[in-house]
Amino acid sequence: MSGYPKSYNPFDDDVEDEDTRPAPWKDARDLPDGPDPPIDRQQYLRQEVLRGPSATAASTSRSLFLMYESEKIGVASSEELVRQRGVLEHTEKMVDKMDQDLKMSQKHINSIKSVFGGFINYFKSKPVEPPPEQNGSIVPQPSSRLKEAINTSKDQESKYQASHPNLRRLHDAELDSVPASTVNTEVYPKNSSLRAYHQKIDSNLDELSVGLGRLKDIALGMQTEIEEQDDILDRLTTKVDKLDVNIKSTEKKVRQL
């Protein structure tokens, strides 16, 4: 026999009292309800409106910083390419000098090969040797396209450092640096903070567009410079091969004396 009375409902134990039910979960961002919105609600709405433009302005500022960093790397790489051109031109000049000296040695060897008239002819008609060249430093001249791109980027870098002295802390404080005269305020919101964000975003995007154009000029200038240096390498390879053949020929003639 069951110990419960006949009128007892065992499922009544599963029914929770309404007063003991947990309160529904609420997001911290949920706005309070009520006929009169408090000041916190207005502040929250204002922050929500500015959240998107603020993040976009910060993102474009970071992109602008990265663009200038890339441009600095491009300029440094271009200058290294110019230095490499100087090395190649100096090497080519030295190979040309070696070729001239070798030709002069071959003339001397040919003049002393004759047993009877060699020495007489050597002293009578000694060829005039060209004066030794001064081994001064060679100033490399890069392609005009690369030179112009380097100068333009360096000039812009000085302007950028003047307007953004703290390059690694581009943040919303730069909003105050946007000149009002450079933009048409009629196309922006009336709210001053929101308008400042929109102006900063447009300013960053314009600067990014111009900067990417300079990066493209650097890339094209480097391409032209590399093509010209490839021509120097081809000439240098041909001259070195020819010099190697002449050295072996001269060495053979000396052994036959």
From Swiss-Prot:
<keyword id="KW-0472">Membrane</keyword>
<dbReference type="GO" id="GO:2000300">
    <property type="term" value="P:regulation of synaptic vesicle exocytosis"/>
</dbReference>
<dbReference type="InterPro" id="IPR000727">
    <property type="entry name" value="T_SNARE_dom"/>
</dbReference>
<feature type="modified residue" description="Phosphoserine">
    <location>
        <position position="203"/>
    </location>
</feature>
<dbReference type="GO" id="GO:0020018">
    <property type="term" value="C:ciliary pocket membrane"/>
</dbReference>
<dbReference type="GO" id="GO:0005776">
    <property type="term" value="C:autophagosome"/>
</dbReference>
<comment type="function">
    <text>SNAREs, soluble N-ethylmaleimide-sensitive factor-attachment protein receptors, are essential proteins for fusion of cellular membranes. SNAREs localized on opposing membranes assemble to form a trans-SNARE complex, an extended, parallel four alpha-helical bundle that drives membrane fusion. SNAP29 is a SNARE involved in autophagy through the direct control of autophagosome membrane fusion with the lysososome membrane. Also plays a role in ciliogenesis by regulating membrane fusions.</text>
</comment>
<protein>
    <recommendedName>
        <fullName>Synaptosomal-associated protein 29</fullName>
    </recommendedName>
</protein>
<dbReference type="GO" id="GO:0098693">
    <property type="term" value="P:regulation of synaptic vesicle cycle"/>
</dbReference>
<dbReference type="GO" id="GO:0008021">
    <property type="term" value="C:synaptic vesicle"/>
</dbReference>
<dbReference type="GO" id="GO:0015031">
    <property type="term" value="P:protein transport"/>
</dbReference>
<dbReference type="GO" id="GO:0006887">
    <property type="term" value="P:exocytosis"/>
</dbReference>
<keyword id="KW-0966">Cell projection</keyword>
<feature type="modified residue" description="Phosphoserine">
    <location>
        <position position="78"/>
    </location>
</feature>
<dbReference type="GO" id="GO:0019905">
    <property type="term" value="F:syntaxin binding"/>
</dbReference>
<dbReference type="GO" id="GO:0031201">
    <property type="term" value="C:SNARE complex"/>
</dbReference>
<keyword id="KW-0969">Cilium</keyword>
<feature type="region of interest" description="Disordered">
    <location>
        <begin position="1"/>
        <end position="42"/>
    </location>
</feature>
<feature type="modified residue" description="Phosphoserine">
    <location>
        <position position="77"/>
    </location>
</feature>
<feature type="compositionally biased region" description="Basic and acidic residues">
    <location>
        <begin position="20"/>
        <end position="32"/>
    </location>
</feature>
<dbReference type="GO" id="GO:0016240">
    <property type="term" value="P:autophagosome membrane docking"/>
</dbReference>
<dbReference type="GO" id="GO:0005886">
    <property type="term" value="C:plasma membrane"/>
</dbReference>
<feature type="modified residue" description="Phosphoserine">
    <location>
        <position position="209"/>
    </location>
</feature>
<keyword id="KW-0963">Cytoplasm</keyword>
<dbReference type="GO" id="GO:0005737">
    <property type="term" value="C:cytoplasm"/>
</dbReference>
<feature type="modified residue" description="Phosphoserine">
    <location>
        <position position="114"/>
    </location>
</feature>
<dbReference type="GO" id="GO:0098850">
    <property type="term" value="C:extrinsic component of synaptic vesicle membrane"/>
</dbReference>
<feature type="modified residue" description="Phosphoserine">
    <location>
        <position position="163"/>
    </location>
</feature>
<dbReference type="GO" id="GO:0016082">
    <property type="term" value="P:synaptic vesicle priming"/>
</dbReference>
<dbReference type="GO" id="GO:0000421">
    <property type="term" value="C:autophagosome membrane"/>
</dbReference>
<keyword id="KW-0970">Cilium biogenesis/degradation</keyword>
<dbReference type="GO" id="GO:0031629">
    <property type="term" value="P:synaptic vesicle fusion to presynaptic active zone membrane"/>
</dbReference>
<comment type="subunit">
    <text>Forms a SNARE complex, composed of VAMP8, SNAP29 and STX17, involved in fusion of autophagosome with lysosome. Interacts with multiple syntaxins including STX6. Interacts with EIPR1. Interacts with STX17; this interaction is increased in the absence of TMEM39A.</text>
</comment>
<keyword id="KW-0653">Protein transport</keyword>
<comment type="similarity">
    <text>Belongs to the SNAP-25 family.</text>
</comment>
<feature type="modified residue" description="Phosphoserine">
    <location>
        <position position="181"/>
    </location>
</feature>
<keyword id="KW-1003">Cell membrane</keyword>
<dbReference type="GO" id="GO:0005484">
    <property type="term" value="F:SNAP receptor activity"/>
</dbReference>
<keyword id="KW-0597">Phosphoprotein</keyword>
<keyword id="KW-0813">Transport</keyword>
<dbReference type="GO" id="GO:0043195">
    <property type="term" value="C:terminal bouton"/>
</dbReference>
<dbReference type="GO" id="GO:0060271">
    <property type="term" value="P:cilium assembly"/>
</dbReference>
